[in-house]
Amino acid sequence: MKVVVAGANGLTGRIVLRMLAEAGHQPVAMIRDFAQREELEPLGAECRIGDLEKPVGYAVRGCRAAIFAAGSGSKTGPEKTIDVDQKGAMAFIDTCVRMNARRFVMLGSIAVDKPERGPESLHHYFRAKAVADRHLQASGLNYTIVRPGFLTNEPGTGAITTGDDLGPIAKETHSVTREDVARVLVDCLNLDNTIEKTFEMIRGETPIADALKAL
């Protein structure tokens, strides 16, 4: 299956590209600069120009599925967060609807429905992500929204905890590796039981395959 990845050049996005190729999919990396091809093409990706703050039809054309793994970054202010994590995500969703990329897996965030569960410094981010999530849920696409806790760069454990609300969040208790998150994003593509599901995830004791089957 041809799968376009928004945020392909990010730390999580690169892992997603590799895992898609390993699983037999055809990953399409949406990038803002063709210079990034040198690092992404060896991961098995076709690279296409696309910027979430501009029309992205070219990047999505011919793809049957999409994974949204983009983000404005933790060092940006509320305005950039709204431009990328909210408006950019919504425009990308609309493009997928228009171009019939019916399967959509969203990398969301823990605590977006209840920002008070997290630090006040992230409330603007939670609110922006919540708006984008609701837009996806109303889009008619076959969506899955994965809401991980704090992302780490450690090797994946292959085991997670999932739930609708995993309680007040802290880095010490609500973290998860990027590798495990990428695995969940990719595996959800072919799991029909995850369609129209929204769930939080952190590191845990349940093997990823078992956790996803139980959703």
Stretches found by the model and what they are:
Residues T12, A66, V146, V181-L185, ...:
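Non-catalytic, hydrophobic alpha-helical segments
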Residues A29-A91, T95-R98, D113, L189-N193, ...:
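NAD(P)H-binding glycine-rich loop region in Rossmannoid oxidoreductase-like domains
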Residues N153-G156, I160-L215:
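Active-site-lining helix/loop region of Rossmann-like oxidoreductase modules
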